[in-house]
Amino acid sequence: MSAELESIDHELEESIASLRKAGVRITPQRQAIMRYLISSHSHPTADEIYQALSPKFPNISVATIYNNLRVFKDIGIVKELTYGDSSSRFDFNTHNHYHIICEKCGKIVDFHYPQLDEVEQLAQHVTDFDVTHHRMEIYGVCKECKEEGN
């Protein structure tokens, strides 16, 4: 088994443990949604998850996807990313990280820059706010769109 598959399986097990601890029943659909989120690096929408899973789960609905994503979000194992186009995207990676977003195709890529972790502490110190979190996005054009000449 590849290291990536082992990592996905490990993260899935941890997520299932978090769901069980919260009293959430583990269903095949729930596991499939969670596995898709863990293995996807594209920050999918609920519709994208539905399109990917509906061939294997013909009885699954978009409402089921949204309901499960809400449960995952409430427990803290998924982040909802909202943007101006009114379509929420979902991110399994809930650790502090940032996003760079392609202005042409909408692709979102995670990146982490440790020095930015100090921003919250500095903001709290300078403003005397109780800082709870922050969000930073960088916009540009991805490699694929540059190559296509979009």
UniProtKB/Swiss-Prot annotation:
Q: Which residues cross the membrane?
A: none
The cellular component terms of Gene Ontology attached to this UniProt record, alphabetical and capped at eight, are:
cytoplasm
User: Would I find Transcription regulation among this entry's keywords?
Assistant: yes
Q: Does the keyword Heme apply?
A: no
Q: Name one Pfam family in it.
A: FUR
Chief localization class?
Answer: cytoplasm
**Positions of the region DNA-binding?**
1-84
* Subcellular localization, as worded in the UniProt entry: Cytoplasm
The cross-references to Gene3D superfamilies, in alphabetical order and at most eight, read:
3.30.1490.190, Winged helix-like DNA-binding domain superfamily/Winged helix DNA-binding domain (1.10.10.10)
Q: Which residues of this UniProt protein bind Zn(2+)? A: 102, 105, 142, 145
What SUPFAM superfamilies does UniProt report for this protein, alphabetically? Winged helix' DNA-binding domain
Keyword field: Cytoplasm, DNA-binding, Manganese, Metal-binding, Repressor, Transcription, Transcription regulation, Zinc
Q: Which GO terms describe its biological process?
A: negative regulation of DNA-templated transcription; regulation of secondary metabolite biosynthetic process
GO molecular function terms attached to this record: DNA-binding transcription factor activity; transcription cis-regulatory region binding; zinc ion binding
Task: Describe the function of this protein.
Answer: Manganese-dependent repressor that controls a regulon of oxidative stress resistance and iron-storage proteins. May act as a hydrogen peroxide and organic hydroperoxide sensor.
State the similarity comment: Belongs to the Fur family.
The molecule here is called Peroxide-responsive repressor PerR
Q: Which organism is it from?
A: Staphylococcus epidermidis (strain ATCC 35984 / DSM 28319 / BCRC 17069 / CCUG 31568 / BM 3577 / RP62A)
Instruction: Please state the gene responsible for encoding this protein.
Output: perR
